[in-house]
Amino acid sequence: MLTIEQLNTLIDAGEIDTVIVAFTDMQGRLVGKRISARLFRDEVGQHGAECCNYLLAVDAEMNTVDGYRVSSWEKGYGDMAMIPDLDTLRLVPLDCGHRPGHRRSEVAR
């Protein structure tokens, strides 16, 4: 777990430069956006971000699926709000410790 205060401290120290705002789609994948950490701190963390509701109306290959009331080619694919749940903040392990210009360690397979 990561508190908003801890996140802000890491942002100010330059330890975090990107925040992923995401939700699970109908296949259980995380979808959303990567946002500048400072933009997240100053705006998105309080007010949310927008994304297309298309993300909730596609199959595993990202093809649109008929039958959804909120979105379709006939009704259109509108924007929806992603409101962060700040009680679910986490560090993403694969992104931890990477610095631009520095070599990334190998991942065991």
Regions found by a protein language model. Name each.
Residues 1-109:
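ATP/Mg2+-dependent ligation/transfer catalytic cores
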